[in-house]
Design a protein with these regions (language model features):
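An amphipathic, aromatic/His-enriched active-site/gating alpha helix that lines ligand/cofactor pockets
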Residues: 17-39, 55-95
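Short, surface-exposed ligand-recognition loops at beta-strand->loop->(often short) alpha-helix junctions
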Residues: 9-19
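Non-catalytic surface loops within mature trypsin-like serine protease
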Residues: 10-12, 58, 96-99
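Acidic/histidine-enriched, glycine/proline-rich intrinsically disordered or flexible terminal extensions
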Residues: 89-91, 97-106
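Generic "edge-of-domain/loop-turn" microfeature
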Residues: 15, 47, 61, 99-102
C-alpha cells in the first residue's frame, strides 16, 4: 500500500474555482478510472494551499492508473488545458508515503 500526499499552490484568487473544478471534474474522472482518493483539504490560514491524498495498492497499480488517467484523450483535451489557469504547476509537491504499523489509514 502506498499513498501520495499532493500539495498545490493556487494562482491568486483561484482557490474556489480550483475546488469546484477538482470536485466536479478531476476527482470523479480519476475515481472512475480506479484511483482511490482518501480526501482533499484547503489551508485554513494559507488560502492558496490545496492538499489531497491518493492511495494505491502497489507501484504497478500506480503506474497503470497514471497511464490510464494522464495519457487519456479526456485528460489531455478537457482537463489539462484548464489546470494552468488555476494552479501554479511549478509548485506542485508530491510526497510518497507508506503507512506505519499503527496508522489508522492503511
Amino acid at each position: 500500500m502506498l499513498f501520495e500526499l499532493r500539495q498545490y499552490r493556487m494562482r491568486p484568487g483561484q482557490r474556489d474555482n480550483w475546488v469546484s473544478f477538482i470536485e466536479a471534474e478531476i476527482i470523479p474522472f480519476q475515481t472512475a478510472k480506479g484511483m482511490k482518493i482518501i480526501g482533499s483539504w484547503v489551508g485554513e490560514e494559507d488560502t492558496d494551499l490545496f492538499v489531497w491524498i491518493r492511495q494505491f495498492e502497489s507501484e504497478a497499480e500506480r503506474e497503470r492508473l497514471y497511464k490510464e488517467v494522464y495519457e487519456s484523450d479526456h485528460w489531455k483535451t478537457k482537463v489539462a488545458p484548464q489546470i494552468h489557469d488555476l494552479i501554479d504547476r511549478e509548485q506542485i509537491k508530491v510526497t510518497r508515503m507508506n503507512p506505519t504499523p499503527g496508522s489508522a489509514i492503511k
